[in-house]
Amino acid sequence: MYSHPHNAGVAAAPQKPETFMLSTEAQQALPHDAQVALQQVDNLKYFLISAPVDWQPDQYIRRFLLPTGEYVSCVLWNNLFHISGTDIVRCLSFRFQAFGRPVKNSKKFEEGIFSDLRNLKSGTDASLEEPKSPFLDFLYKNNCIRTQKKQKVFYWYSVPHDRLFLDALERDLKREKMGQEATTMAVSEPALSFQYDSSQSLYEQLTKAQQANSSSFNAQQVSFPPSQSTSPVMRAMDSMPPPPQMMPQPMPQSMAPLADGLDAMVPYAAMGMAPGMPPQPAVKREPDFNRVQYNQNGVPINQGHQRHASMPAYGLEYSPAPSFVSSHYDDYGNRGISFEPLTPPQQAMGMGAEPAYIANEETGLYTAIPDHMNGVNGLNGMIQLPPSNLAGPQFTRSYGSNNVYSVIEGSPTYKQRRRRSSIPPGMSAIAAATAAATAAHRPSDLRRSVSASVGPVAEGDESLDNSPPGLIYSNQPMSMANHQREAMEQMSRHGTPLSTVEGSPGMHNVNLEQQQYPMPSEDMTSPMDDRSRPMAQGGPSVVRRARSATVMGSEVGPYPQKSHSCPIPTCGRLFKRLEHLKRHVRTHTQERPYICPYCSKAFSRSDNLAQHKRTHDRADGGEGLILSGEDEEEYSGDDHLGSLEEASPTSEGGYVTSSLNSAMAHSNTSQHPGSNAVSPNPGPMSHAPTYNSMQTLMQPMQMSQPQPINAGGMM
């Protein structure tokens, strides 16, 4: 049904739902119109991956213009990102048109999609809205829904877009096979070349194609450490195989802010660079390894460079490559509605390191910003982003032919395609071996299989053990890395910005004084109540995030074995459990859906809110140490692995309130053992050092960022 080239000279065919049955040669032989249409599908997937990133405080909706003329919107409501069922149908209708099977019975087609969407349950993967609720009214006014009747609005990353496409396609293919009327009709390539194998579902066939593609891609790569030499021969071996030779498209070097309004589009050629930009230096062929600079996650640029080079095919396949750039360069952030570009970055063979990009929604092109800019201030405080061309300046990624945006997986509860953690401990090693066969081998797989056979591992351990190799300082001895990890744990408990702690597991020797990234006030920890867990469970993610909408992971099999990758390109962390990825993504999106009913303070984790509630209980004269049934259920999180995996050294730690005086009072009470606020179990804290509370409070105050918006309050 489909073929896979296994010779080392040809790159493996990209395994996308539309073309996974075609060989590389067949894909290259597709008509030009079909290739353009499939590229437009990739542009949509890029938006589906990246829409919740880099939002401004006054922004509550971000739109993507489909080639059909309709918009798909990402809506921020109650600190969660949503997509409507109507927009999901619009995405799928466009994808079928690009696939060569335009919809001819839209009503029946839409009914099938909404039937599939019933598998996404409210409260877990969607928000059930009452008729004419403020949220539905907002969606209706922005053309996201057609009616304000009672309906579910889905969490952004809970929607399995590719699975919905394959399920809808399979329904129509079965109808055609039985002689019934289908909702779509094949009129062009690649739909005309699609051969349906009814012995197994299309989703299973795609999964097997993904696995076979991953294996063949791995066989082409040599496991060398990232080279820092100037020899292109050695660099070619530790980078991705070169893309097909295509003529470079000239990248315009300037653009201007866009005017407000829906139709205020400026011709691309007439746009000028935003004021205040420094002169653009020549892009160097080789990165400068003599100086150490840090990206927004606190990872040195050369370490990020190594991460991209050493990321296995598994990581390359599921993580988008281009770097995000703050919307400082355009005027998107100055209005409530944002528009996304029509295309992700295209290849530019003549350039050195693949640059970051600025979006232009008019033409669908991106303006390149050199990686090596003299003025860091031009990035609005963001330190330089790492070159993202996988360590090979000679070979930039080709978005039209390589594995990119292959599978967008939503909620694991969709049609129960992924089992919960019900595998017996003895089977964990087998699961690890299975994952190693289907995904690229990682040196830490053996450690994970041993750890999993003993018991669950705290998320802090996972972040180091299973991050891409380049994220951890490979040039440091393990003892030194562990020592610095413990030091980072202590610092993170007393004022380290969350974005730097959780966003980069390998950030050990970063000078925190230079970090310009914020830490929300409710996430500052004080030494008041650090009494909860043994320090052995700690790690760089000792301050972690709460349950979130389900986030996409990568599809490598039914076993819970590190199959979830952070969709943010500059991060790329891997997680075994989807719940951990959900919490981690909130460090990027700054969602805080848990609101205190007493003071309306927002929290990103339910256990943080539960701990905060206890401060109110203590203020009312109660101990506040016993959780109610509802709080305990929230505190336990989504998974059922017990307290070990869910535990965090600061999960029950006290949080600084909005009043500096109350924070000082709590700090003073924590230093007097006779106080009623002291934990009845002060054992673990008896060996912890005492910190100056003013110093603790002052450190995060050097960092400023507007608080995340609550669109509900704006209405």
Curated annotation (Swiss-Prot):
Stretches for region Disordered: 214-243, 439-469, 518-539, 632-691
Keyword Nucleus: yes
A Pfam family the protein falls into: zf-C2H2
One Gene Ontology term of the molecular function aspect: DNA-binding transcription factor activity
An example Gene Ontology biological process: sexual reproduction
Annotated zinc fingers (C2H2-type), start-end: 564-588, 594-616
Comp. bias regions, Polar residues: 648-679
Signal peptide: none
Keywords of the record: Metal-binding, Nucleus, Repeat, Transcription, Transcription regulation, Virulence, Zinc, Zinc-finger
Gene Ontology cellular-component annotations: nucleus; Ste12p-Dig1p-Dig2p complex; Tec1p-Ste12p-Dig1p complex
Biased composition, class Low complexity, residue ranges: 214-224
Superkingdom of origin: Eukaryota
Annotated knockout phenotype: Impairs pathogenicity on rice and barley leaves but does not affect appressorium formation. However, fails to penetrate onion epidermal cells and to cause spreading lesions. Reduces significantly the expression of the cell surface sensor MSB2.
Family of this protein: Belongs to the STE12 transcription factor family.
Protein known as: Transcription factor MST12
Protein's gene: MST12
